């Protein structure tokens, strides 16, 4: 037995451990123990290295599984959008300020999409976490306006007193505006040839039916 060799292997194991080269560090310890099976410091070092290596491996495997699930879900959603003919696009650098995502109920084969209802007259909005593709615009508005919003104390905003629009986008990127009726299903909007589901988030614009100067000015921005 060469005591110097054991000490050198021990020092190497500690150095490799510090560099997070765990298999190599284990190898050094095991070689040292071949020369000195009862060396307790080497045994302790080997146990520490193996424990840390196992902990890191569990973290790595868990991360890989999470990333795999994310990839699988992304492919599933992309397939569902393509199957329905829904145009989608992503804005470079866009980071949503909400945690909600498009979901697919595989059993029912139904999509739900996080959706903003915007009220430009009051600079307010509502985020619907999961708007089901089979629900109508009217059904969603009835739920939203069941009670008066704080910004609408007179409860002027109700399904029958408002008009709902969605923005259109042609192949040239020109933005337009299209009115949508209360009985129209969300899926009908999503599959419209000029509708683009951008950044995994749907948007509807809700304004009063009443013709006011504000409304005329607002429509004029869209060339209406």
Regions found by a protein language model. Give the residues of each.
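Intrinsically disordered, low-complexity regions enriched in small/polar residues
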Residues: 12, 24, 96, 121, ...
């Amino acid at each position: 037995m060469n005591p110097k060799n054991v000490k050198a292997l021990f020092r190497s194991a500690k150095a490799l451990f510090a560099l997070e080269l765990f298999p190599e560090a284990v190898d050094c310890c095991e070689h040292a123990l071949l020369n000195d099976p009862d060396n307790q410091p080497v045994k302790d070092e080997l146990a520490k290295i193996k424990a840390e290596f196992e902990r890191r491996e569990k973290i790595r495997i868990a991360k890989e599984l999470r990333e795999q699930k994310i990839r699988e879900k992304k492919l599933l959603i992309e397939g569902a959008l393509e199957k329905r003919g829904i145009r989608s696009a992503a804005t470079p650098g866009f980071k949503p300020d909400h945690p909600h995502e498009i979901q697919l109920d595989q059993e029912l084969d139904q999509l739900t999409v996080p959706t903003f209802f915007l009220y430009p007259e009051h600079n307010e909005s509502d985020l619907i976490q999961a708007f089901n593709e089979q629900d109508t615009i009217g059904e969603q508005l009835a739920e939203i306006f069941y009670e008066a919003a704080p910004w609408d104390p007179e409860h002027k905003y109700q399904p029958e007193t408002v008009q709902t629009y969605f923005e259109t986008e042609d192949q040239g990127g020109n933005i337009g505006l299209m009115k949508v009726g209360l009985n129209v299903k969300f899926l009908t909007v999503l599959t419209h040839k000029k509708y683009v589901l951008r950044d995994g988030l749907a948007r509807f614009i809700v304004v009063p039916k009443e013709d006011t100067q504000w409304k005329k000015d607002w429509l004029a921005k869209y060339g209406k």
